[in-house]
């Protein structure tokens, strides 16, 4: 889906759900990170996170567009357009728009892999796993008091 198709989708949803035209611009903004979309108060444009389409498809985009159009139409009419406003919450229920979008952040793999040190006793082969490297000259086996050696 590109910006032109998104613009047509927003205009169609606006007419079907609100019976009012959407006369401004709707486009994808790849810089959005944690939000599905946003309504810009000064320009009246709507920005949509392209990651929402990639992860969840057209159904999620339609929900985000409905939500942002609630902000849009209430702001244009001079009514309460913020999330905390009663008029906004009522309009969300009326058009069956979601209050929140699905989670967009994918869990990143841990950057720093936890390092483990494995020691073994020379006499009885008792294993010791430690996060912090230790001086084998200073410590001995707790079972037989034998010498320790680093495996990894």
Curated annotation (Swiss-Prot):
InterPro entries: SprT-like_domain, Uncharacterised_SprT-like
Signal sequence, start to end: none
One Gene Ontology molecular-function label: zinc ion binding
Binding site for Zn(2+): 67, 71
Domain SprT-like stretches: 6-151
Pfam family name, one: SprT-like
Entry keyword set: Cytoplasm, Metal-binding, Zinc
GO biological process: response to stress
Cofactors required: Zn(2+)
Acyltransferase listed as a keyword: no
Cellular-component GO terms for this entry: cytoplasm
Cofactor: how bound: Binds 1 zinc ion.
Subcellular location(s) of the protein: Cytoplasm
Active site: 68
HAMAP family listed in its UniProt record: SprT_like
Protein family according to the UniProt entry: Belongs to the SprT family.
Matching NCBIfam families: PRK04351.1 (NF003339)
Protein's name in the database: Protein SprT-like
């Amino acid at each position: 889906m590109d910006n032109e198709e998104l613009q047509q989708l927003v205009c169609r949803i606006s007419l079907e759900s609100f019976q009012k035209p959407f006369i401004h611009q709707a486009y994808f903004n790849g810089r959005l990170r944690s939000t599905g979309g946003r309504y810009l108060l000064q320009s009246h444009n709507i920005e949509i996170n392209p990651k929402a389409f990639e992860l969840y498809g057209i159904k999620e985009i339609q929900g985000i567009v409905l939500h942002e159009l609630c902000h849009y139409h209430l702001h244009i009419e001079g009514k309460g357009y913020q999330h905390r406003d009663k008029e906004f919450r009522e309009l969300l229920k009326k058009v069956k728009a979601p209050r929140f979008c699905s989670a967009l952040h994918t869990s990143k793999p841990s950057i720093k892999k936890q390092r483990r040190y494995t020691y073994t006793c020379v006499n009885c082969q008792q294993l010791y796993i430690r996060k912090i490297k230790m001086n084998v000259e200073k410590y001995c086996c707790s079972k037989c008091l034998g010498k320790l050696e680093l495996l990894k």
